C-alpha cells in the first residue's frame, strides 16, 4: 500500500530541478524566500499582479521561546498581522538565518529569558552572533521587542533588554518602545499587539489574501491542539512511586498519568504542563495569620468564588518576589522591610530566602481579601520533561519529579507543584495537563545517527523517553549515556532499566558520576573530560549531543567541558572550539533542555 501511495507525495520536479531549487533556496534569507514565494506563485497564476513594493516589505516575527509562552504570543501577533492583510512570516529563532539579518526591514522579536539572565535555548546562536564582532550594521531595520520574564529572578526580562539595546547599537530603529512583562503578561501583550499592528498598517502596503506571502520552510508550525495551557485536559494519575532510597537526601517520584481519550500526542523531548493546586494546610496558615476565614467572596476571572478556592487554584503561594516584599512593606509600614525597598540587591535576596508565608509570619498584619490577592501573582502551570515515549507507553505520560523541600525557622517548606504531585495527588485522582511541544530537543531524523545523552538528577527523564523510542523503532544508532547524582546506592534513577538496555545492546556505553561517594566530588563534566578523545571521535562521526539539567549550574559546566575537550582533541583554541560547538547547535547536533 505504501508503494501505491508514494507517487502522490513526490514533487512535480525532476531530481535535477529539485537539486537546483534546494541549492538556490538554501542561500536565501527569510525575506528573500518570502519574496520568491510570492513571485513564483504569481508566475504560476498569471492572473493576479503582484505588488513588488509590498512584497519587499515583509514583516518577520521572530519567536525566541523556552517554555512556550513567547511562541504562543508570537503566533498571536502573526495571526493579527495576517488579519490586517500585511505580509508576514513567523520563524523560530533556532531556524532563523541570522547571518542574513541585515536584509530584514521590519523585525518583531518576542523573547523569553531563561533562568537568571540567559537567552532561551533556541536563541543562543542568534544572541551570540549579535554580540560578536561579526554582527553587521543594521541601519535598514525597524524593530520592536516584547520581553517575557519573571520578576522573582535578579535579571528580569534581561534578554529582551539585551536584544533591544544591541539592535539599537547596530543602527536599527525602534518601531515601538520595548515592553518587559512578568508572568501575568497577557494584558500587556494584548495592548502591544494592537499597537504594533496599528503602526505597521500606517507604514506598509496591505495586500489581499491571495497575495499574502508565506514561508513554508522555517515557519513555526501553528499546532491547534484540542487541549492547551488555557484549556487543559483532565487526566488521571495511575502510578506514583518513590525511586530514591529511604536514606537519600532527595525525594524523587516516578509518575504515570493516563491521557486516554484526550487525543494528545507527544514526542520524546516534549514537556507536560501541570496545573497544580496549593496545599490546604498552607492556605489555612496564611488565612489565620492575615485574619481571614477563607469564606470571603472574591472575583477571579469575572466569577465570584470563595477566597479559599482562589488561593488553592488561582494564585502562587510558594514563590516570593521583590515586588511582593515591596508592596507588603508599604502596607505594613514595617521599618525592616522598608529599609530593603531602596536596596534592590537586598530586596531580591530577602524575597529569594523568605517564602511569603514566613514573611507574613514574622510581620503579621490584617488584610482585606482584595489586598491579599493584589499582592499575589497568578498561579502558573509547571512544566516537566516527559520521561516516556508513546511508541512504548501509549496513552500515558511518565514524569520524574524531584520534591522541592527545605527548612526555614524550624519548619519544613515544600514547592507548590512538586509537593502536590508527590504528596497530595493520589492514584486515580484527576489532574489538569497539556502538552508543551519542544522542537528544540528532538532525536535525529536518521535513526542510524549516534546520540550522546548527558543528564544529572531528574535531567535523566527525557533520555528514558529517548531510549524507549529508539527501542520501539529499532533504531540502529549508537547510544551513550552520562549520568550524575549524589550516591550510587541511593540515587541511581531507573537503574534496572539502564542495566537492561546495556544487556540487550541498545545502550552502548554508560558513564556515571556520584558526587558524594568519595572525598573529591565528581560530576558529569569530569567524566566528559575523562572520555574526551572517544567523545571527540563520536562527534566527528556525526553524533548528536543532548544535555538536560539545571541551566545555571550543570548545563553551564557541561558546556564548558565540551568546549574544552573540543579544543584539546580538535586542536583548536578556545574561540575556535566555542565556534565549533555553536555550529553544532545551529545544525541541531547540540541540543539542551534546561530548567
UniProtKB/Swiss-Prot annotation:
PANTHER family in the record: NADPH OXIDOREDUCTASE A, NITRIC OXIDE SYNTHASE-RELATED
Which species does the entry assign this protein to?
Baumannia cicadellinicola subsp. Homalodisca coagulata
Q: How is the subunit organization of this protein annotated in UniProt?
A: Alpha(8)-beta(8). The alpha component is a flavoprotein, the beta component is a hemoprotein.
Task: Please state the gene responsible for encoding this protein.
Answer: cysJ
Protein name listed in UniProt: Sulfite reductase [NADPH] flavoprotein alpha-component
Q: Which UniProt keywords apply?
A: Amino-acid biosynthesis, Cysteine biosynthesis, Electron transport, FAD, Flavoprotein, FMN, NADP, Oxidoreductase, Transport
InterPro entries found in the cross-reference section = CysJ (IPR010199), CysJ-like_FAD-binding (IPR003097), CysJ_Proteobact (IPR029758), FAD-bd_FR_type (IPR017927), Flavdoxin-like (IPR001094), Flavodoxin/NO_synth (IPR008254), Flavoprot_Pyr_Nucl_cyt_Rdtase (IPR001709), Flavoprotein-like_sf (IPR029039)
Gene Ontology cellular-component terms for this entry are: cytosol
Instruction: Name the domain of life.
Output: Bacteria
Where does this protein act, in terms of pathway? Sulfur metabolism; hydrogen sulfide biosynthesis; hydrogen sulfide from sulfite (NADPH route): step 1/1
UniProt cofactor(s): FAD; FMN
Q: Which reaction does it catalyse?
A: hydrogen sulfide + 3 NADP(+) + 3 H2O = sulfite + 3 NADPH + 4 H(+)
Q: Which residues form the Flavodoxin-like domain?
A: 59-197
Amino acid at each position: 500500500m505504501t508503494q501505491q501511495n508514494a507517487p502522490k507525495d513526490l514533487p512535480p520536479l525532476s531530481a535535477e530541478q529539485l537539486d537546483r531549487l534546494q541549492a538556490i533556496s538554501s542561500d536565501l534569507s527569510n525575506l528573500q524566500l518570502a519574496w520568491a514565494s510570492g513571485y513564483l506563485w504569481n508566475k504560476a497564476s498569471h492572473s493576479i499582479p503582484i505588488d513588488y513594493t509590498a512584497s519587499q516589505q515583509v514583516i518577520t516575527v521572530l519567536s525566541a521561546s523556552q517554555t512556550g509562552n513567547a511562541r504562543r504570543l508570537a503566533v498571536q501577533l502573526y495571526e493579527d498581522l495576517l488579519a490586517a492583510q500585511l505580509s508576514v512570516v513567523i520563524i523560530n529563532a533556532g531556524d532563523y538565518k541570522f547571518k542574513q539579518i541585515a536584509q530584514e526591514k521590519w523585525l518583531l522579536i518576542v523573547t523569553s529569558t531563561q533562568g537568571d539572565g540567559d537567552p532561551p535555548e533556541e536563541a543562543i546562536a542568534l544572541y551570540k552572533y549579535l554580540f560578536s564582532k561579526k554582527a553587521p550594521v543594521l541601519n535598514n531595520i525597524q524593530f520592536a521587542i516584547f520581553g517575557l520574564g519573571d520578576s522573582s529572578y535578579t535579571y528580569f526580562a534581561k534578554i529582551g533588554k539585551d536584544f533591544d539595546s544591541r539592535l539599537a547599537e547596530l543602527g536599527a530603529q525602534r518601531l515601538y518602545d520595548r515592553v518587559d512583562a512578568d508572568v501575568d503578561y497577557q494584558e500587556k501583550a494584548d495592548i502591544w499587539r494592537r499597537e504594533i499592528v496599528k503602526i505597521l498598517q500606517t507604514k506598509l502596503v496591505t495586500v489581499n489574501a491571495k497575495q499574502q506571502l508565506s514561508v513554508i520552510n522555517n515557519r513555526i508550525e501553528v499546532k491547534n491542539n484540542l487541549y492547551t495551557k488555557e484549556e487543559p485536559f483532565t487526566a488521571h494519575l495511575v502510578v506514583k512511586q518513590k525511586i530514591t532510597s529511604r536514606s537519600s537526601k532527595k525525594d524523587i517520584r516516578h509518575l504515570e498519568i493516563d491521557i486516554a481519550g484526550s487525543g494528545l500526542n507527544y514526542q520524546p523531548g516534549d514537556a507536560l504542563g501541570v496545573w497544580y493546586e496549593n496545599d490546604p494546610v498552607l492556605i489555612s496558615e496564611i488565612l489565620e495569620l492575615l485574619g481571614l476565614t477563607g469564606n470571603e467572596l472574591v472575583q477571579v476571572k469575572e466569577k465570584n468564588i470563595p477566597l479559599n478556592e482562589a488561593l488553592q487554584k488561582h494564585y502562587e503561594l510558594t514563590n516570593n518576589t521583590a515586588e511582593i516584599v515591596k508592596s507588603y512593606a508599604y502596607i505594613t509600614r514595617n521599618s525592616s522591610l522598608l529599609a530593603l525597598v531602596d536596596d534592590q540587591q537586598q530586596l531580591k535576596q530577602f524575597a529569594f530566602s523568605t517564602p511569603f508565608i514566613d514573611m507574613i509570619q514574622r510581620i503579621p498584619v490584617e488584610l482585606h481579601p482584595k489586598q491579599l490577592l493584589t499582592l499575589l501573582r497568578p498561579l502558573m502551570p509547571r512544566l516537566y520533561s516527559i520521561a516516556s515515549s508513546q511508541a512504548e507507553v501509549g496513552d500515558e505520560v511518565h514524569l520524574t519529579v524531584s520534591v522541592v523541600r527545605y527548612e526555614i525557622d524550624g519548619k519544613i517548606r515544600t514547592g507548590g507543584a512538586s509537593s502536590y504531585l508527590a504528596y497530595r495527588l493520589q492514584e486515580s485522582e484527576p489532574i489538569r495537563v497539556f502538552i508543551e511541544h519542544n522542537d528544540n530537543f528532538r532525536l535525529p531524523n536518521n535513526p542510524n545517527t549516534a546520540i550522546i545523552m548527558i543528564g544529572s538528577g531528574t535531567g535523566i527523564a527525557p533520555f528514558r523517553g529517548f531510549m524507549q523510542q529508539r527501542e520501539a523503532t529499532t533504531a540502529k544508532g549508537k547510544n551513550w549515556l552520562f549520568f550524575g547524582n549524589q550516591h550510587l546506592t541511593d540515587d541511581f534513577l531507573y537503574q534496572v532499566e539502564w542495566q537492561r538496555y546495556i544487556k540487550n545492546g541498545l545502550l552502548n556505553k554508560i558513564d556515571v558520576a556520584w558526587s558524594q561517594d568519595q572525598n573529591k566530588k565528581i560530576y558529569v563534566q569530569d567524566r566528559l573530560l575523562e572520555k574526551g578523545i572517544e567523545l571527540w571521535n563520536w562527534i566527528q562521526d556525526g553524533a548528536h549531543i543532548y544535555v538536560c539539567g539545571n541551566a545555571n549550574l550543570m548545563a553551564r559546566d557541561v558546556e564548558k567541558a565540551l568546549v574544552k575537550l573540543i579544543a584539546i582533541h580538535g586542536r583548536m583554541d578556545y574561540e575556535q572550539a566555542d565556534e565549533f560547538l555553536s555550529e553544532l547547535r545551529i545544525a541541531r547536533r547540540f541540543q539542551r533542555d534546561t530548567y
